[in-house]
Amino acid sequence: MNNIFYNDYISNGLLEVLLINDYITNGFKVEFLDIFYIISITFGVFTIISRNPVVSVLFLIGLFVNIAGILILAGINYLGLSYILVYVGAVSILFLFILMLINIRISELLSETNNDIPLAVLTVLLFYYIIGQVLPCNLTDKTIISSLSNRFTGIYNIDISNQSSIVGINQEIGYVSSKGWDNTLVEFTQISGIGNIMYTNYSIWLIISSVILLLGMVGAIVITIKQK
């Protein structure tokens, strides 16, 4: 993220760091995120209420592309491009080909699906509430949707619009690199940071997920084997 300014001063013998609000995200103003929010919510609703499953998958592809755009605007370029490659290039296209191969009855396409609209709206609101608690407060606090959520919910517990957020140096901060002071000054790329986290702190979870994927492949092969 660009245009993040830091100001340090000495108070009570401790070095404090002031984080000033960030209005620019990856070279773009954060107001552009409102456009992606509205389009993503629209695609998400139409994905659920669409009667034709093929059209529903197309809306799902559009939803994934918009989410990738949000990640790219947030400065997470690697995850945004990975979203397009994995979800759009593999998963969604696989769903689309499967739906084209199976026999879908016309009566199923013409069936009433308006009952799913409340579920679609509830799912979108729940997803946004969870994402709002995960993302940093200074990332989207100037957007329209975030201002509405701040009015009705207290999901952002740090107010940096009037007062700068103060982070004490004595607080525990998790670094991707080792504990050596010289390594903390080295700038990591996103790929290096993700690789260091996956293969050091969360290596056991990486192994567990690999075993789960292996069991899924073996299970699919066992099910499809013809019994003699």
UniProtKB/Swiss-Prot annotation:
GO CC aspect terms: mitochondrion; respiratory chain complex I
Main location: mitochondrion
Superkingdom of this protein's organism: Eukaryota
Keywords attached to this entry: Mitochondrion
Gene Ontology MF annotations: NADH dehydrogenase (ubiquinone) activity
GO annotation (BP), single: mitochondrial electron transport, NADH to ubiquinone
Compartment(s) where it occurs, according to its Swiss-Prot or TrEMBL record: Mitochondrion
Keyword Glycoprotein: no
Record has Mitochondrion as a keyword: yes
InterPro entries to which the protein is assigned, alphabetical: NADH_UbQ/plastoQ_OxRdtase_su6 (IPR001457), Nuo/plastoQ_OxRdtase_6_NuoJ (IPR042106)
Record protein name field: Uncharacterized 25.4 kDa protein in COX3 5'region
Natural source organism: Emericella nidulans
Organism lineage string: Eukaryota, Fungi, Dikarya, Ascomycota, Pezizomycotina
